[in-house]
Amino acid sequence: MSASDRDRVLAAAAVSRETAAALDLYVAQLARWQTVKNLVGPSTLPEVWTRHIADSLQLLDAAPGATRWLDLGSGAGIPGLILAIAGREARPQMQVDLVESNARKGAFLQETARLTGASARIHVSRIESVIGRFTGVEVVCARALAPLPQLLAWTAPLLKSGTIGLFPKGREAQSELTAARETWTFEADVIPSRTDSSAGIVRISSLSGQLP
């Protein structure tokens, strides 16, 4: 990780000094926990500001004004915990629920949320066990968790109620959309990623049901 990567990402995001300090603390926590728990791909850690933080922050622009978020399979808190840290000042009413089934990763999320003051609640549980508990969710997101058809199966109760889905994807975005349309009807667009020209954010809305 270079200082220029950090400075460039923070300048582009136009965050306050306090939010920058909280993101620095997140990065320090990630590096410390990475030595005992493989939270992210080891090769991506030197590029944490561009590969993970900037990649997560761009989701805020994909849902302007949204303050109730749900992040599934949070892992290292990407994107959910990063959004909760950045949203603390940018969107004072921001609340992000993070669902992670792995207890060790859940412990990382809980400790880091506490230290950074992130507007986050951690649920150490399987998605299927808790998805029905969430109401009033404006955006549900998940990164590097599952193919789109499975994501829609998990989040259908929310997406049918007006929640928007934001799912970062790589080159497979279009093929996963095609596969999902074999089962579901929905509206979708792919927002080009600002951090990877071969990737995009699949935005799903108006899910209306499974096809026969």
Curated annotation (Swiss-Prot):
- What is the taxonomic lineage of the source species? Bacteria, Pseudomonadati, Pseudomonadota, Alphaproteobacteria, Hyphomicrobiales
UniProt name for this protein = Ribosomal RNA small subunit methyltransferase G
UniProt keywords, alphabetically: Cytoplasm, Methyltransferase, rRNA processing, S-adenosyl-L-methionine, Transferase
Q: What is its EC number?
A: 2.1.1.170
Where does it live in the cell?
Cytoplasm
Q: Which family does it belong to?
A: Belongs to the methyltransferase superfamily. RNA methyltransferase RsmG family.
Q: Which residues form a coiled coil?
A: none
Gene3D superfamilies in alphabetical order: Vaccinia Virus protein VP39
Q: Where along the chain is S-adenosyl-L-methionine bound?
A: G73, I127, E128, R143
Establish whether keyword Methyltransferase is in the entry: yes
